[in-house]
Amino acid sequence: MVSFSSLLLAVSAVSGALAAPGDSTLVELAKRAITSSETGTNNGYYYSFWTNGGGDVEYTNGNGGQYSVKWTNCDNFVAGKGWNPGSAKTVTYSGEWESNSNSYVSLYGWTQNPLVEYYIVDKYGDYDPSTGATELGTVESDGGTYKIYKTTRENAPSIEGTSTFNQYWSVRQSGRVGGTITAQNHFDAWANVGLQLGTHNYMILATEGYKSSGSATITVE
C-alpha cells in the first residue's frame, strides 16, 4: 500500500512544478475524507478515527479544532479531535449532531495502568449508552447532572489491542451539543466512588455511532 505521506510528497513535487507557492492543493488534501482507522495531528490538535469497517463512515478534519463525520448503516466507529496525552482539562466545544439512533457526543479517552476507557456523554440518541451498566452516583457539573456508571468490557478492542478493561461513564441527563466540560469534576467524582484512572493516553471530543446513521460537525476550542 502507498502511504499517505508518500502520496503527499509526490503531490508536493507536482504542485511545486505547476503552481505558485500558496496553492490550495495541499490544503484540500489535508481536508480529505478518511474512511479507515487513522490517528495523527491536524492544526495543532490530535485526531483519532477508529472504525471496525462496517457500513459507510467518512471523517474529515476541518479548520482549527473542527471535524465532521457522516455515517450510513455503520457498525461501530469513534472519531474526534483533542489532545494526546489528555488531562483533567476544561474543554469548550460547539457543533451540530444529527442521529436519532445509537450515537453519542462525549469527551472520550483512555488511560493506562490501569487500562480504562472513559466517556463524559453530553448527548445521545434513542439508546442510552449506560444501559446495563452499574450506577454509582451522580455529579453536578457545568450546569447539568451526570449519572456515573461503570461497565467491564471483555476481549474488546483497546489501545493495547484486544483486552479486558473497565469503562467509566458520566452521562448528562439533559442532553446538549456544545458547552463546557470540566473533566476534573468528573475525574474527582469517579475517584470518590472508587473509579481510579491511570496515566492519560489520548482524549478527544468524540462522536460515536453503533449500528446507526447520522452526521456531526464539532469544533473544539
Swiss-Prot record:
GO biological process terms held by the UniProt record: xylan catabolic process
Residues forming the catalytic site: 117 (nucleophile), 208 (proton donor)
One Pfam family this sequence matches: Glyco_hydro_11
GO molecular function, one term: endo-1,4-beta-xylanase activity
Location of this chain's protein in the cell: Secreted
Chief site of localization: secreted
InterPro entries, alphabetized: ConA-like_dom_sf, GH11/12, GH11_AS_1, GH11_dom, Glyco_hydro_11
Reactions it catalyzes: Endohydrolysis of (1->4)-beta-D-xylosidic linkages in xylans
Domain of life per record: Eukaryota
Enzyme Commission number, as recorded: 3.2.1.8
Disulphide connectivity of cysteines: none
Pathway stated in the Swiss-Prot or TrEMBL entry: Glycan degradation; xylan degradation
Positions of the GH11 domain: 33-221
Keyword annotations of the record: Carbohydrate metabolism, Glycosidase, Hydrolase, Polysaccharide degradation, Secreted, Signal, Xylan degradation
EC category name: hydrolase
Signal peptide as annotated in the record: 1-19
GO CC annotation terms, alphabetical: extracellular region
Keyword Hydrolase attached: yes
Similarity field: Belongs to the glycosyl hydrolase 11 (cellulase G) family.
Function: Endo-1,4-beta-xylanase involved in the hydrolysis of xylan, a major structural heterogeneous polysaccharide found in plant biomass representing the second most abundant polysaccharide in the biosphere, after cellulose.
Designated name of the protein: Probable endo-1,4-beta-xylanase B
The organism's taxonomic lineage, starting at the top: Eukaryota, Fungi, Dikarya, Ascomycota, Pezizomycotina
